Each structure stands twice: as C-alpha cells, then as structure tokens.
C-alpha cells in the first residue's frame, strides 16, 4: 500500500473525509490505507463498506451478514448462485473472505485510482456505485 498524495493534492484520508462530508456519510475510520464507512439501510440494518487503497487500485468491500465458522458450513448452493450472478455483472463480484476468523460472503469491486476516485467523475459515480454494491450485498 502507499501513502502518497493523489493527483488532486489531497491525501486518501482527506479525500475520503471531504467526499463523505459532502454526502453526509459517516466515516467510522479513515487512514491513508483504508476507510470504513457505515450506512443505515432502509431496513434499519447497519451496513459497513470498506475502501482499501493499494498502490494504484481501490478495493470496495461490502461484507454481507452471511458468516460461517468453517468452510464445511458454507452453503454450496448459495455459493453457486452468487458465482453465477458475478458472471452476469460487469461491475463487482461475490467472494468469500476471512473476517475475524469467519468465512463471510462479500461483494467487492476493484478499480484503478486514475479511473475513478481521483477523477471528476467520482463525484457522480461513487454514490451510485456504493448504493448499487450495498443493494447487491443484501440477499
């Protein structure tokens, strides 16, 4: 990961904080490497979105509520459905990641920083992208 400034002259943390303040979004945590955003869904459920910064890539990670103690407990039929959905979509993908010792279904999207976050398009694209990803992460 890198902590260098972006082409707009602000650090990753500052850019995320300013952007979220503009949309009245809550930043739970932010560093130069990642940000943790939290939203309240229409169902009143709290949803977390992580934005991880790598050298030239941002990873948007939306963990679902589906978490399992072992690989044996993962419902393979659901995994098959989610893999098929991933194949049908142009943006984002389903995966299983380890979080806190559990196997969690998560929806992710990776994007080159130059193509999204540090461009002017970010001010239009990211709210829609995050909402779209959060909706996809809800079963």
Regions found by a protein language model. Give the residues of each.
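Charge-rich, low-complexity N-terminal segments
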Residues: 1-49, 88-89, 97
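Ordered, soluble secondary-structure elements with a strong preference for glycine-centered loop motifs
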Residues: 6, 10, 72, 115-122
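Conserved short hydrophobic interaction patches
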Residues: 19-22, 81-88, 124-138
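Hydrophobic residues embedded in beta-strands of well-ordered beta-sheets
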Residues: 35, 58, 103-105
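Short beta-strand-to-loop capping motifs
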Residues: 39-41, 64, 109-111
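Short, well-structured hydrophobic secondary-structure segments
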Residues: 42-67
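Short, internal acidic amphipathic alpha-helical interface segments
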Residues: 61-104
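Well-ordered alpha/beta subsegment
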Residues: 93-126, 130-137
């Amino acid at each position: 990961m890198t902590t260098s400034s972006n082409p707009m002259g602000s650090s990753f943390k500052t850019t995320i904080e300013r952007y979220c303040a503009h949309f009245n979004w809550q930043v739970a945590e932010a560093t130069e490497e990642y940000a943790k955003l939290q939203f309240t869904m229409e169902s009143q459920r709290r949803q977390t979105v992580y934005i991880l910064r790598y050298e030239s890539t941002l990873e948007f990670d939306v963990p679902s509520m589906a978490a399992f103690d072992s690989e044996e407990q993962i419902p393979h039929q659901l995994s098959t459905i989610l893999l098929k959905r991933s194949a049908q979509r142009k943006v984002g993908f389903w995966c299983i990641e380890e979080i806190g010792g559990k196997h969690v279904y998560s929806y992710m999207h990776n994007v080159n920083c130059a193509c999204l976050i540090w461009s002017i398009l970010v001010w239009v694209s990211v709210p829609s992208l995050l909402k779209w990803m959060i909706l996809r992460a809800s079963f």
